[in-house]
From Swiss-Prot:
This is Pseudaminic acid synthase. Catalyzes the fifth step in the biosynthesis of pseudaminic acid, a sialic-acid-like sugar that is used to modify flagellin. Catalyzes the condensation of phosphoenolpyruvate with 2,4-diacetamido-2,4,6-trideoxy-beta-l-altropyranose, forming pseudaminic acid. Optimum pH is 7.0. SMART domains: SAF. It holds the Pfam family NeuB. Residues 287-343 form the AFP-like domain. It comes from the Bacteria. Belongs to the pseudaminic acid synthase family. One of its GO terms (biological process) is carbohydrate biosynthetic process. Its cofactor is a divalent metal cation.
């Protein structure tokens, strides 16, 4: 899949999710973009919304978070605190372009999509909490841009519906990210095999949106077929934000990128042919050698022929065929046996 100038068929697409890790500072946001590029990220992703894009400014119990990292916080207040203001976007997209890192966003309502159009984004991201809103999904599909969908809380029925909508809107560029919508995510709750299931069941590009500590999960995800990795990024450990508890700092993110690149390199092309480097070591494979002096006319037997390393003699597959045949010449102990040595 082509996302901007990036081809996911050739390389795993690594996204640094900024989210709330600007900690309310535009300067921090711009520094984070530059740092993400240096850490090896292919793209920086932001979130485009106002609190009104997401919820109602209500004090009713329905709108108070219960449990988890944001326990007892009011939804409206949480989103007000975590948002990336509209007025920052121009500088964010400009900085990303200047730094040579791709930039796109997760919108959450029609007005967010309309606002983002002015930046001609390379892609859109749909958060899993919006994946059940068919009208919103269709709005994004109509944009005809590559679209990445986190599947965290989405049901199979909803995911099939998303595929149907994108097909109807003639938008083939759809990515499903395996995602566990708990913050942070315990490693035993990751269910990474779901990456394989998403690929097989929905026939779309797949990846991982990771909220766990460390970067074991992204590396494993690549081995399971992930072509997109999204991980929350922060400038350093001094950042305190709504997402900092499950984010990687510069050094950690760089280490993750290096590990992911090593993992995809280690996967290879799946072909079973021996490459040139391995073929050189074929010299240490077994072959047939004289384990004793053998006189001309003497029969080959288990007593005077042995399959040993290295491989300059006959292939061991000729061992049984050779037994009982007569030597056509004198053969010394340690001589490699050849086709012309028997009659």
């Amino acid at each position: 899949m082509q996302i901007g100038n990036f081809n996911t068929d050739k390389k795993v697409f690594i996204i640094a999710e900024l989210s709330a890790n600007h900690a309310g500072s535009l300067e921090m946001a711009l520094k984070s973009i530059k740092a993400a590029k240096k850490a090896g990220a292919d793209a920086i992703k932001i979130q485009t919304y106002t609190p009104d894009s997401l919820t109602l400014n209500s004090d009713k119990e329905d709108f108070i978070i219960k449990g988890g990292l944001w326990d007892k916080r009011k939804l409206y207040e949480l989103y007000e605190s975590a948002k990336t203001p509209y007025e920052w976007h121009s500088q964010i997209f400009e900085t990303a372009q200047n730094e040579g890192i791709l930039c796109f966003s997760s919108p959450f309502a029609k007005e967010d999509v309309e606002f983002l159009k002015r930046f001609d984004p390379i892609a859109y991201k749909i958060a899993s909490f919006e994946a059940n809103d068919e009208n919103f999904v269709r709005l994004i599909a109509k944009e005809k841009k590559p679209t990445i969908v986190s599947t965290g809380i989405a049901t199979e029925e909803e995911l099939f519906k998303i595929c149907e909508i994108f097909k109807e809107e003639k938008n083939p560029d759809l990515v499903f990210l395996k995602c566990t919508s708990t913050y942070p995510t315990a490693i035993e709750d990751m269910n990474l095999k779901g990456i394989v299931s998403l690929k097989e069941k929905f026939n779309v590009e797949v990846g991982l949106s990771d909220h766990s500590f460390g970067f074991l999960a992204p590396v494993m995800a690549v081995a399971l077929g992930a072509r997109v990795i999204e991980k929350h990024f922060m400038l350093d450990k001094s950042i305190e934000s709504e997402d900092s508890k499950f984010s990687l700092d510069f050094d950690e993110f760089k280490a993750m990128v290096d590990a992911v690149r090593q993992a995809e390199s280690a996967l290879g092309d799946g072909k079973l042919d021996l490459d040139e480097k391995v073929l050189k070591n074929r010299v240490f494979a077994r072959s047939l050698y004289a384990s004793k002096d053998i006189k001309k006319g003497e029969m080959f037997s288990e007593e005077n022929v042995k399959s040993v390393r290295p491989s300059f003699g006959l292939h061991p597959k000729f061992y049984q065929e050779l037994l009982g045949k007569k030597a056509s010449k004198d053969i010394k102990f340690g001589d490699a046996l050849k086709q012309g040595d028997f009659q």
